[in-house]
Regions:
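Compact, glycine/acidic-enriched structural inserts
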Residues: 113-134
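Short acidic-glycine loop/turn motifs at beta-strand connectors
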Residues: 97-100
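A surface-exposed partner-binding patch
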Residues: 1-93, 138-140
Length: 141
């Protein structure tokens, strides 16, 4: 992960979140899923490839909006409780289904949820692999 963050131009300025800031978010809203919490505390957000993963500042803005969208749109879909973690360029919100652990995307303009990854760890590993492959291709040019 560290290597991917070093080679990616999209992670410049991304830094670990202070634990007290993470705890403030959790006391205000809800606990952050463990793997996402680890990423925030060790690296911050993730912009290696799509989907991007929110920094804490972005999460603080997105969480209330997600809660509203969850009530308005997402409650009709088949999934467990959800926690927003990022987004896609098409405006989709990316979330963790807290019951299954699956990472999914929801775009209110479409009728279905998009399956993105089996779990947060596999999503992160996929993003790291994409960034390392892109870095390798750039060096070859």
């Amino acid at each position: 992960i560290q290597t991917a963050y070093k080679v990616s131009p999209f992670t410049k300025g991304t830094c670990p979140e202070p634990e007290d800031a993470v705890k403030r978010f959790e006391s205000r809203y809800t606990p952050i899923p463990a793997e996402y919490r680890w990423l925030l505390l060790n690296f911050g957000g993730c912009y290696l490839a799509e989907p991007w993963i929110f920094t804490l500042k972005e999460l603080e803005k997105a969480y209330p909006i997600f809660q509203e969208a969850y009530e308005d749109y997402m409650s009709e879909y088949d999934h467990g409780p959800a926690f927003p973690i990022g987004g896609l360029g098409d405006g989709s919100i990316v979330f963790i289904d807290l019951e299954s652990g699956r990472v999914r995307g929801c775009n209110c303009d479409y009728a279905d949820l998009k399956e993105i990854a089996e779990n947060f760890s596999s999503l992160l590993l996929d993003l790291v692999e994409q960034a390392l492959e892109l870095g390798k291709l750039c060096r070859e040019l």
